[in-house]
Amino acid sequence: MPKPADTNNNKIPESHYDIVKGNNYAQVAMVMPNGSLANNTVAFVWDGEFVRFSTLKARQKYKNLAGDQRVALCIADPAHPWRYPEIRGNAESTEDTDRSGINSIAKKYMNQDVYPFDQPGDQRVTFTVKPTRIRAEYVHAADGTPENIGIQRG
């Protein structure tokens, strides 16, 4: 079985654009304040360079990332779960006072201009994942053999 390909330039390869542009969800692994690991599913947007996701300051996810910015995201192709980009890096937070971050996610996933579920007083932040390494995995055919989907190895 071939190893995943490193993109070497910290960019998602074009062969995986459909995964990050689609209405798929990311699994975000992070470190909790006590040193144990946590993994959460998040909705996200990708701007062609960075993956961004949103959370409330009251959530554990925010507390985890405020203490340790290291993350690993995996976004699986729902039709072929062995095909995915993995993005490792640091999640940098910005206040989302104008709600543009969460509203862009609402537009992508709900086709709504404004995210409808925040309550008065909710403090929202957007995390931008600055990649340190990106890997892109192959598709595995139904017979179990790997298919090369055009990722160059070097």
Predicted segments — roles?
Residues 17-18, 43, 63, 117-119:
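Short secondary-structure boundary/capping segments
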Residues 12-16, 61, 101:
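Hydrophobic alpha-helical segments typical of transmembrane helices
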Residues 59-61, 80, 143-144:
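Short, surface-exposed beta-strand-loop junctions and turns on beta-sheet-rich folds
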Residues 2-26:
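Short, basic/aromatic recognition patches
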Residues 23-57, 63-65, 71-75, 84-86:
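Short beta-strand segments
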